[in-house]
Amino acid sequence: MLRYLISIFLVVSVAIVVSNPVRGEVLTGSGLVDVPTGRVLQHGIFEAGTYLGFREDGTDRSSANLGDAVAVRLNFGLFDRLEVGLTHLWDEENPDSTVARTANLKLLLLKEPETGVVPGVAIGIEKLGNKVFSSDAEAEGSETPSAFLAVSKTFNLPRVHLFSLHVGVGTQRFAFEESRVGVFAGLSKEFRPAFARGDIAMRLEFDGSGVNTGLRYITSSGLQVALGAEALNNPDELRYLAAVSWTNEKILERIDAMNKLIIRATALRNETERAISKKAADKATETPSSQ
């Protein structure tokens, strides 16, 4: 199965490489703020929503690429190995501008087990076109797709408890100024406070050029609200992100939990019926002997 998935991944990647460049994704469920991780969405799980990105100096319309931008996206997982992301974005202040479309792919090579030292490892390709979100210089340097390899590992430390470390290497937007390849890294931690009635995920990352941070809140119904900031180390390039989406993951978790309860209840009922039948058989055996 993995061999066929790799073949499909390579074929689709080649198709993307020769298409028009567009922008990548931010604040996705399997990623951090703007960098990927060594994880993918599980089979049958999808996320659909929208996100907004704008610079601090977005009121200056002397250059269209500093304007606010809105995107609609869909991410879904296949076979617990492949994640596909589709994004449709446009310049909010200039509706007549060219619409950007992207298809991002990520293939899971190694799945991180619940216990053990094996990390999660994934490779992927992002089809980037930074006409809206970035400067002309950045867009010019990102005309080709960005390929990456990401590794993720969860650690359990005293007081800190569970947190995840993510590192990777990538081309194009991840690359350093004088290099074709760069590194990225990040930290993520999830909380489940009683007052929140949901999960809260905090993220901090370095994407090869800047430091980004984000906060995501996931309700029990699957609604996700995320806020983020990019380029914290460069006030002149500081930009903000906001996203709202919905995922079916919580519903599937409830269905899975309900199925487990049904299986357990069925097993208990069968055990009870067997115990009653055995008791009745033993009683029937004892009655003739007593006579």
Task: Kindly give the residue locations of the regions a language model identified.
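Positively charged n-region of N-terminal signal peptides that target proteins for export
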Residues: M1-Y4
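Bacterial N-terminal signal peptides
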Residues: S7-V17
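Transmembrane beta-barrel domains of Gram-negative outer membranes and organellar outer membranes
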Residues: V22-E143, A147, T154-L157, L215
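Feature captures outer-membrane beta-barrel proteins of Gram-negative bacteria and organelles
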Residues: G38-R39, D68-F79, A100-E114, I123, ...
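Outer-membrane beta-barrel proteins
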Residues: T59, P95-S97, V132-S134, F176, ...
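Extracellular loop and loop/strand-boundary signature of outer-membrane beta-barrel proteins
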Residues: S135-A137, R173, D199-A201
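Flexible, glycine-rich linker and terminal segments associated
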Residues: Q224-A226, E230-S290
